[in-house]
């Protein structure tokens, strides 16, 4: 999300993150705090477990840890914890109306009500997303690979 926000400063970038993912990369908050992208909204959906890998508890299951406090300490002044839908709506309205970066820590209940069945191919998802950005921004991110004859000629 940060790279996209920095590369496309005229676009609003909203990152949806899970608590497990964020716990494994807390340094991302410090990097966001350092670069201060005005167009970035980072939402952490905290269900207090690694749901995708079996439901083991994350560090936030202790209720002593505060993602919003960590974000503020990392330099993201606009950082909040939301516990209700109304709080989430209010904070999103604020974030959309004001320069960021913004961090929203949303406490949610673990468990899925519907099992999603969809093919998941990380490489295909990457290319699909990049092609969408190329089309909507009118830019080239990925170039076509050079043919063998061009590579040998030093082009």
Question: How would you label these PLM feature ranges?
Answer:
Residues 1-133:
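Thiamine diphosphate
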Residues 119-155:
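SAM-dependent methyltransferases
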């Amino acid at each position: 999300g940060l790279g996209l926000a920095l590369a496309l400063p005229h676009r609003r970038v909203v990152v949806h993150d899970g608590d497990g993912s964020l716990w494994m990369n807390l340094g991302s908050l410090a990097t966001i705090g350092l670069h201060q992208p005005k167009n970035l909204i980072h939402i952490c959906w905290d269900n207090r477990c690694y749901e995708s890998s079996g439901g083991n508890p994350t560090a936030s299951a202790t209720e002593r840890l505060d993602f919003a406090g960590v974000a503020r300490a990392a330099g993201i002044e606009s950082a909040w914890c939301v516990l209700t839908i109304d709080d989430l709506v209010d904070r999103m309205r604020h974030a959309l109306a004001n320069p960021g970066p913004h961090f929203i820590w949303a406490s949610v209940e673990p468990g899925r009500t519907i099992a999603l069945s969809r093919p998941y191919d990380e490489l295909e998802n990457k290319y699909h997303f990049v092609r969408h950005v190329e089309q909507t921004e009118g830019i080239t991110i990925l170039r076509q690979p050079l043919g063998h004859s061009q590579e040998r000629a030093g082009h």
